């Protein structure tokens, strides 16, 4: 009898350990379908990734500014060319896969209605019902398994460098608040968002649809999320624990964009600009660890260096000059896909190039805490300096290991189109995705 009890106990422990870190949530930016050149991700390319993903988040539907209803931001692709249906139909080939439609994200830019997501929270009930019904209709009509809310809230103001004077006070002041208050009505918006999520969940419950929440980069969870209340409303939360510093937000200094842990504090780094702080905060509020997915980016943030940035490349790097030029694949200044980054590192094809074509110097992270760095300083021959903070397969694997140690639900990958989906780096397609899957 004692042997049987011991066997049962061990079996339960094993089941619990295998249940944790089982999610690999893959974000799919459908705008990659319309890119030109090597960044164009077609459905056959997408399908290769699905064997590794537990969930696919289709991005992005938007919020129509005029009536605050959910809608496809590219109806020609999503509806008339049947991309919604083409992607959800892949579940027949990959029956383990759940496909969710994401509303919001940082793609939904509307200069005429810049505050529309807050307007929805503050709006009349009839407008909120219109949003909920329109979102439900998209999910139901096109065969999605649920809805993801990548809700837009005001972001923390960018970090600023301060001298030693007043440093201790500023660190305490910013610990939970960011640099400055950006929303004087945040407490009210927190209540309103919880009520909206509750109503969305009620609309999805009868069909058994999933509801997830994406916490976008630099959104302060203490301001906007009633975490204990959300626990009973969402199936899981994806924390976008990256882009803590970017060349757009921090044009004059470069630093780690997505460290797991807080780097040394001697350079006035804020305590909350790392993945562990964000995870620990959600856990401290009673949110179950197995409902948290750790966000990992498949791209790097790239700053333009100047002659005053120095030659060593050790962060914090001063006197940078905003975003580096866009890459051939990502086509966004200051952002390089992993395929673009690995192509710039030293290899047999570029190791003898000089000047502005010379390869980047890779700086490894023996601590496995902060992620990779690569740079090319400005010197006598080089006028186009660049400094990149990024995750490669090794550092992404370290983050998957962190998720396991913390008993998290898994990892959320942002996104498939910036991984090396063509296998240009090592011959393996989706090397970051694979590295995470093999470590979970």
Swiss-Prot record:
Glycosylated position list: 220
GO molecular function terms listed in the Swiss-Prot or TrEMBL record: chitin binding; imaginal disc growth factor receptor binding
Maturation and modification: Glycosylated.
Annotated GH18 domain residues: 22-440
UniProt keyword Cytoplasm, yes or no: no
Subcellular location: Secreted
Pfam family, one: Glyco_hydro_18
Keywords: Developmental protein, Disulfide bond, Glycoprotein, Secreted, Signal
SS bond partners: 26-53, 342-425
SUPFAM superfamilies the UniProt entry points to: (Trans)glycosidases, Chitinase insertion domain
Tissue specificity statement from the Swiss-Prot or TrEMBL entry: Primarily expressed in yolk cells and fat body. In larvae, it is expressed in the imaginal ring and weakly expressed in imaginal disks. More strongly expressed than Idgf1 and Idgf3.
InterPro entries: Chitinase_II/V-like_cat (IPR011583), Chitinase_insertion_sf (IPR029070), Glyco_hydro18_cat (IPR001223), Glycoside_hydrolase_SF (IPR017853), Glycosyl_Hydrlase_18 (IPR050314), IDGF (IPR015520)
One BP annotation, GO: carbohydrate metabolic process
Signal peptide: 1-20
GO CC terms of this entry: extracellular region; extracellular space
Misc: Lacks the typical Glu active site in position 152 that is replaced by a Gln residue, preventing the hydrolase activity. Its precise function remains unclear.
Family named by the database record: Belongs to the glycosyl hydrolase 18 family. IDGF subfamily.
Job of this protein: Cooperates with insulin-like peptides to stimulate the proliferation, polarization and motility of imaginal disk cells. May act by stabilizing the binding of insulin-like peptides to its receptor through a simultaneous interaction with both molecules to form a multiprotein signaling complex.
Record protein name field: Chitinase-like protein Idgf2
Source species: Drosophila melanogaster
